[in-house]
Amino acid sequence: GFESPGLTTIMKCFTFIGSTPSVVVISLFSLFFLYKVLKHRTELILFISIIVGSPILNELLKLLFHRARPDFHRLIEINGYSFPSGHAMSAFAVYGVLSFLLWRHIPTRWGRTLLIVISIIMILAIGISRIYLGVHYPSDVIGGYFASGCWLAIAIWFYQRYQEKKFEQRRPIQSKK
């Protein structure tokens, strides 16, 4: 069908970008940027909890489902269970949390749109690369997006509740008349 040497090279690049070593480098750079450049402190806790929690959740789900990887037309070899895709979960976690944290620092609609478009492209390209390379079924990737999306939403919800309580504690107490 769609297989070609050039496309295979591109898909291997996206798979590499979604691999653990790349996610670690992207995460370390992001932590430095959030801390040193944007002077974020509490956001680091959110970022770390999402980035650390996503692979833990992935491993738990793989142990729960025990789904074998596709055994036909693999372009790369990999071991372990298939569902959910760890690359899809990592991509959704990293680019999702970065979009959430960077959104408020981008003043223009064009800049925000670019942030979201780049994030969506990276998330989709990494997931599609796993299907193309024959190491995941489409449902593995979709399940990875869903699991990571749930984890991201829960973590952001707790973070926002924490921020609201912190803000309420800083407000001066209004005297009753």
Residue ranges and their predicted role:
Residues 1-81, 98, 104:
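Hydrophobic alpha-helical bundle signature of multipass membrane enzymes
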Residues 71-177:
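Membrane-embedded catalytic cores of phosphoryl/pyrophosphoryl-handling enzymes
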